[in-house]
Amino acid sequence: MNKIIKFHNERIKWLWILTAILAISFFVICFNNVKWIYTENTAKYELLTSSLEKIVKFYSFSLVDKPFARGVPNSIDVFSRAIIGVAFGLGFVGTMLIDYFIISKVAYIVKQKIKQSKKVGM
């Protein structure tokens, strides 16, 4: 029983570590374009915090007629990577939680069986 619980705790610890690594890499992929850009309409430099912010600015609010015609493929690529990252992250966390509940249930059943066998032995 203790071996099962020890294995279970060790496995959950590594799954949380992998989930944290996945989340950090997702943010690095999505928010890696922190740089200063020059905007022609306001004639000043602005800090562009992320590619996703650029997509939201140009597509949601339609600030310009042709949203950076040369940069459209890059924006679509970043957006698709973000969607893939979110889907992969949710799938990974979901799998981890399902695994956690299954192993918890198995450990609980084994614990109950051990208690029953001790009562019968007495």
Curated annotation (Swiss-Prot):
Keyword terms, alphabetized: Cell membrane, Membrane, Transmembrane, Transmembrane helix
Domain of life: Bacteria
GO CC entries: plasma membrane
Record's subcellular location: Cell membrane
Membrane topology per record: Multi-pass membrane protein
Residue spans crossing the bilayer: 14-34, 83-103
Protein name, UniProt field: Uncharacterized protein UU165.2
Lineage: Bacteria, Bacillati, Mycoplasmatota, Mycoplasmoidales, Mycoplasmoidaceae
